[in-house]
Amino acid sequence: MYIKLFEDNPNTRDILKVVEVLNAGGIIIYPTDTIYAIGCDINNVKAVQRVCQLKNIKPEKANFSMICRDLSNIAAYAKVNNEVFKVMKRNLPGPFTFVLPATNKLPNVMINRRKTIGIRIPDNYIVMSIVEELGNPLLTTSVKAEDEVVEYMTDPELIHEKYEKLVDLVIDGGFGQNV
């Protein structure tokens, strides 16, 4: 499936379709404030395992991040001291990932050997609308090939061509930032 959304005003019906796919255990590709990302509901173990297969990584070795809806949502999944909270408050939403110690509320399949989790609150209304409607964080991992940023990671039509048989939904939110 392929859905075109406008970042400034994503269609609510389309956001609900995306959440329906996620609730059914689907994997999506969506825009962030940097490049496009692959994601799923962090509470769906099978979906997380599918993302691991797609990225050809073992869950215990994965360095996954998740997108939270706001700073108050983070404390349930990561240990945040006052200093880190102040830094996050100054810099989020934005193109940053904060790697923090994981709490035991994080699903086991998301916890790596170092027991850390990357936390993001991107400055992108599409993905933030999805997370808000989903009601819990979204697993996020970059759409990239061997740590090399290439055109297909920022062009939603090329992403769709490459991944349409591997994921359940690609969201076209315009060209990515290639950051």
Task: For each feature predicted by the language model, list its residue ranges.
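Active-site-adjacent structural elements in enzyme catalytic cores
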Residues: 1-179
